[in-house]
Amino acid sequence: MRHPLVMGNWKLNGSIHMVHELIAALRKEISGVAGCDVAIAPPTVYLCQARHEIGGSRIALGAQDTGVNLSGAFTGETSPEMLKNVDVKYVIIGHSERRTYHKESDEFIAQKFGVLKELGLTPVLCIGETEAENEAGKTQEVCARQIDAILNAHGAQAFKDAVIAYEPIWAIGTGKSATPAQAQAVHKFIRDHIAKQDAAIAEQVIIQYGGSVNDKNAAELFSQPDIDGALVGGASLKADAFAVIVKAAAEAKAKK
């Protein structure tokens, strides 16, 4: 059975004081919660501090992005080897903010995916459609294209022990969210699409939902059979709200 993952993407938020306070509160809030994996992805400059703050807890460390080069004259980049060196486990790639603001292509994201897998890091591949694409009925087409970039470059086996996060772009940071039924339909499509190449891999791949997940809608989302946790934005900056989401994922798994 798949183990849900709830991961907090802190985006461009944080300070030394905030990292300390938030992790301390989060450790207290989720102490004793089982049945759900938990990770946080702070800004890169706070990874080492976060590693120290989560020490001895069940919280795993994530990163918000990675470069594809391991070393060299690449000013401003962070290599996946560096992330591994500070005990990062999960690495978010393909987030819509990277695709939009940094013009990252499906092929470039597939390159990142491959490098992470080679180093034993877990890619968290973000996919999803814009509001215009959603209204035009192109959700499945867009998600298939983004998944196919990985399948074509690396094969279905690359999704073994990987994570996919379906994040409809129109729901990120907007307060809007797909209904549980809408999200489930897309998650099932993603799983079925991978299953065309490898049913066993498709069955075990974790597919998170992202896009204005909060403490109010998490439980209903997680009740759906193909939703395996969440990639959480704004709500991950509040320990109590994030903890409610973690607990909802754990409770939903116990019922499945």
Swiss-Prot record:
| UniProt xrefs under CDD domains | TIM (cd00311)
Query: Which ranges of the sequence are coiled-coil?
Result: none
Record's keyword terms, sorted: Cytoplasm, Gluconeogenesis, Glycolysis, Isomerase
Q: Where is the active site?
A: H95, E167
The reaction(s) catalysed by this protein are: D-glyceraldehyde 3-phosphate = dihydroxyacetone phosphate
Among the GO biological process terms of this entry, one is:
glycerol catabolic process
Q: Where in the cell is it found?
A: Cytoplasm
Q: Does the keyword NAD apply?
A: no
Q: In UniProt terms, what function does this protein have?
A: Involved in the gluconeogenesis. Catalyzes stereospecifically the conversion of dihydroxyacetone phosphate (DHAP) to D-glyceraldehyde-3-phosphate (G3P).
What family does the database annotate? Belongs to the triosephosphate isomerase family.
Query: What PANTHER family has UniProt attached to this entry?
Result: TRIOSEPHOSPHATE ISOMERASE
What protein name is recorded for this chain? Triosephosphate isomerase
Tell me the organism.
Proteus mirabilis (strain HI4320)
| Gene name tied to this protein | tpiA
